[in-house]
Amino acid sequence: PPKHADNRRVFAYLRSRGVDAEIINHCIKHGQLYEDAERHNCVFVGYRNDKPAYGALRGTLSDSTFAGEAPGSDKRFSFAVPRCAGGKTLCVFEAAIDALSYLTLLKLRGQDWRAANTLSLSGIYQPRKDGSIRSPVALEQYLKDNPGVARIVLCLDNDGPGRAASAAIQKRLSEYEVIDNPPRRGKDYNDHLQMVKGISGRVKTRGGEAR
């Protein structure tokens, strides 16, 4: 979507959800986050060969529950921080805001958030009846593009679909060291961050994240 002249609503929304200002500004500076001109949604941008290839949308109004994708998005190239990945460990989340929340938690603990590699799957697939699951295309592509990854930390949601997806991915990627690391409190890492910071009034999302 076209960019708004500024990112004030996006910045204010993410700050209200507990995300650290430095991390928000980092994503804006590197072209990974902006405010869309028409609806003022957060747009979390994923890249392919330094060109935008994916956009996850999230409403910023106080009563908004919207989550979706920009038309023409290629989910293989989902939102990841940093854009230029490195290192052997990858932390995987269902949503972009959970990845940013995790980085904020690292900073609160005095750890170097810039050293972490995070990937949003932009939703998960529901497991099949036999318990198997389609491998998330964003994760498959990331591992293909970054063969140095040896350890995968699954930071998926603390609910039925998230737990089932985590178990299925662990089984599917047995050649890697896979660690299950759901949030200690709340449904997801943004929930956990808000609890740590004492923020209340979380709004659940609905809409176009793939399942």
Predicted regions span which residues?
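Terminal peptide-recognition signature
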Residues: 14, 44, 94, 102, ...
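Conserved phosphate-coordination/catalytic loops
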Residues: 70-71, 93, 133-134
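Acidic, divalent-metal-coordinating active-site segment for phosphoryl/phosphodiester hydrolysis
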Residues: 97-98, 165
